[in-house]
From Swiss-Prot:
Species name: Francisella tularensis subsp. holarctica (strain LVS)
Gene that specifies this protein: smpB
PROSITE patterns assigned: SSRP (PS01317)
GO molecular function, one term: RNA binding
Name this protein carries in UniProt: SsrA-binding protein
Ranges of compositional bias, category Basic and acidic residues: 135-157
């Protein structure tokens, strides 16, 4: 075995989350999967666009994360692409997330799904929703940074 660690390979990202929310704190969570789900994840059949995390009975659950079943994977099992999946977190992390979610305006969303060794991990975040004017300001800042880089590139060419 190699002594060098390979960077975790990203399976899916929730790009809409960075546009719609202000990220406050990130957590790494394991996820409970069935065999056909792992096979579909290896094929890249994951969508995390409208997914979110809920805490129920002291456990974290991932909702609306679509894992599309492969046609060749276990045909004898009825596959539910939008099933809720359990997230594996420490008790202190769950309590911290639960305390923040109960406050008005806070939510918990998944940011990305990636491989860490042979296991699938989900990066979740405590987030606060952006208002329309915040989104516009963020877009203006991004456009100005891009324009500034273009101007510097032309000036020093």
């Amino acid at each position: 075995m190699s002594k060098h660690k390979v960077s975790p390979a990203t399976i899916a990202k929730n790009k809409k989350a960075l546009h719609d929310y202000t990220i406050l704190e990130k957590f790494e969570a394991g996820i409970v999967l069935q065999g056909w789900e792992v096979k579909s994840i290896r094929a890249g059949k994951v969508q995390m666009v409208d997914s979110h995390v809920h805490i129920k009975h002291g456990e974290a659950w991932l909702f609306n994360c679509l894992i599309t079943p492969l046609l060749s994977a276990s045909t004898h099992v009825v596959a539910d692409a939008a099933a809720t999946r359990k997230l594996l977190l420490n008790r202190r992390e769950i309590n911290k997330i639960m305390g923040r979610i109960e406050q008005k305006g806070f939510t918990c969303i998944p940011l990305s799904m990636y491989w860490k060794g042979p296991r699938v991990k989900v990066e979740i975040a405590l987030a606060q929703g952006k208002k329309v004017h915040d989104k516009r300001q963020a877009q203006k800042d991004k456009d100005w940074a891009r324009e500034k880089d273009r101007l510097f590139k032309k000036a020093y060419k």
